[in-house]
C-alpha cells in the first residue's frame, strides 16, 4: 500500500510542515519585528491541542518532517509536552525546532527526552554589545550557555542560523564559523527576508548575498560543494579544514529555492501559509472550530489548500515590503 502524499498543482511533493506555536518572543530582533510589537490576544491563537490536531492530520497525509517555530517557541507554556505528543506520531521522521536559545540552558535536556531530533539556534553576533543591539533585549552569554546545554543533552547536527547584514555583522562571518567549528555545529547563513516594515535599517543597503558570504569565507577556509540535504532551503557546503560540519546558504533573493519547495507553514492563528513570500492561505482554525471531532474535514481543507501553493515568491532586495506580516507572525 502506497504512502499518502500531499502534492501541489506543480507536482511538488509537500512533506514538511513548519508550525508556529506562538508569536511572542523574549527578543525583538531588528529584522524580525517592530520594537514595540503588539502580540495576538490569547483567544485568537490555537490551543496546544488544536496544534496537535493539525500535526496529526498532516502526518496522516504524508508529512515526514515538522519544525516548531515562533516567535520563540520555548516561551509558550506546555511546549515540551506538545513536542512529546508530536514526536510520537506514527510516520513522523523528524521533529525539529528553531529557537533563539535563550531558554535552552534549562529546556535542552527535556526537549531531547521529549523526542525533538534537531535544533536550529539563531546567532547573528558573538559581540555581546552588538548582539544586544541586534536582538534589542538578548543576552549573548545566556544563548551560548543554551548552545552548550544542547550539546550536553545529546543533540547532534545542531545548526546556527545567522542572518547576514551588510554593515551590521558581515565582518563576523568567519568568527561565527570558527565558533561553530569549535562546538561541532552546522551553520546556515541567511539573506535577510523582506517581511514586515522595519525602521532599524534600510534592507536595500543591508543586503548581503550568499555569494558575498562565500567570498568572505574563502578568505580563511576552503569550501567544498556537498550533496547534503535536510529537506529545507539550505544549499550545503563543507570545509576542507573541518569536514564534519555543514555550511548552508539560504538565498531567497540571489538563488531562490522555489522550484523544489516541499513545505508549508502554519501561523499560531491557524493560517496555513502556502508560501513564505505570498499571502495565499487557508484558515485552519475556522475549520477546526466549526467541525469538532471531524478530522476528515480538516484533512480535506489541507488537501484542497495545496492547489493554492504558488510557483514562487516575489522577493526583491530593495526597500519595498512584499509581505506586511512580520517574521514572528509568520513562523521563523
Swiss-Prot record:
Residue ranges the record marks as coiled coil: none
EC numbers for this chain: 4.1.99.22
Chain positions recorded as [4Fe-4S] cluster 2 binding sites: 258, 261, 275
This protein's UniProt keywords: 4Fe-4S, GTP-binding, Iron, Iron-sulfur, Lyase, Metal-binding, Molybdenum cofactor biosynthesis, Nucleotide-binding, S-adenosyl-L-methionine
One Pfam family from the record: Radical_SAM
Pathway field: Cofactor biosynthesis; molybdopterin biosynthesis
Entries under Gene3D superfamilies matching the protein: Aldolase class I
SMART domains from the UniProt entry: Elp3
Catalytic activity: GTP + AH2 + S-adenosyl-L-methionine = (8S)-3',8-cyclo-7,8-dihydroguanosine 5'-triphosphate + 5'-deoxyadenosine + L-methionine + A + H(+)
GO BP annotations, alphabetical order: Mo-molybdopterin cofactor biosynthetic process
Physiological role: Catalyzes the cyclization of GTP to (8S)-3',8-cyclo-7,8-dihydroguanosine 5'-triphosphate.
Subunit structure: Monomer and homodimer.
Family assignment from sequence similarity: Belongs to the radical SAM superfamily. MoaA family.
Protein name, entry field: GTP 3',8-cyclase
Source species of the chain: Pseudomonas syringae pv. syringae (strain B728a)
Amino acid at each position: 500500500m502506497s504512502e499518502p502524499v500531499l502534492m501541489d498543482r506543480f507536482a511538488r511533493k509537500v512533506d514538511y510542515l513548519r508550525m508556529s506555536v506562538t508569536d511572542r518572543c523574549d527578543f525583538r530582533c531588528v529584522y524580525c519585528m517592530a520594537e514595540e510589537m503588539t502580540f495576538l490576544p490569547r483567544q485568537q491563537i490555537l490551543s496546544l491541542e488544536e496544534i496537535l490536531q493539525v500535526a496529526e492530520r498532516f502526518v496522516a497525509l504524508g508529512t515526514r518532517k515538522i519544525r516548531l517555530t515562533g516567535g520563540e517557541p520555548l516561551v509558550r507554556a506546555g511546549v515540551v509536552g506538545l513536542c512529546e505528543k508530536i514526536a510520537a506520531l506514527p510516520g513522523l521522521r523528524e521533529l525539529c525546532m528553531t529557537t533563539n536559545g535563550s531558554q535552552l540552558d534549562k529546556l535542552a535536556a527535556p526537549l531531547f527526552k521529549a523526542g525533538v531530533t534537531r535544533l536550529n539556534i539563531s546567532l547573528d553576533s558573538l559581540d555581546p554589545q552588538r548582539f544586544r543591539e541586534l536582538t534589542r533585549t538578548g543576552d549573548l552569554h545566556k544563548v551560548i550557555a543554551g548552545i552548550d546545554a544542547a550539546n550536553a543533552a545529546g543533540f547532534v547536527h545542531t545548526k546556527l542560523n545567522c542572518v547576514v547584514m551588510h554593515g551590521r555583522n558581515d565582518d563576523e562571518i568567519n568568527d561565527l564559523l570558527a565558533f561553530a567549528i569549535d562546538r561541532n555545529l552546522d551553520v546556515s547563513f541567511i539573506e535577510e527576508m523582506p517581511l514586515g516594515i522595519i525602521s532599524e535599517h534600510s534592507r536595500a543597503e543591508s543586503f548581503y548575498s550568499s555569494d558575498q558570504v562565500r567570498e568572505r569565507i574563502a578568505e580563511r577556509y576552503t569550501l567544498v560543494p556537498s550533496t547534503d540535504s535536510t529537506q529545507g532551503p539550505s544549499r550545503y557546503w563543507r570545509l576542507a579544514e573541518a569536514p564534519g560540519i555543514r555550511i548552508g546558504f539560504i538565498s531567497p533573493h540571489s538563488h531562490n529555492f522555489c522550484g523544489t519547495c516541499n513545505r508549508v507553514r502554519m501561523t499560531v492563528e491557524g493560517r496555513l501559509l502556502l508560501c513564505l513570500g505570498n499571502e495565499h492561505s487557508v484558515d485552519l482554525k475556522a475549520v477546526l472550530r466549526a467541525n469538532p471531532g471531524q478530522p476528515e474535514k480538516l484533512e480535506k481543507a489541507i488537501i484542497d489548500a495545496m492547489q493554492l501553493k504558488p510557483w514562487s515568491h516575489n522577493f526583491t532586495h530593495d526597500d519595498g515590503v512584499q509581505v506586511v506580516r512580520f517574521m514572528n507572525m509568520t513562523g521563523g
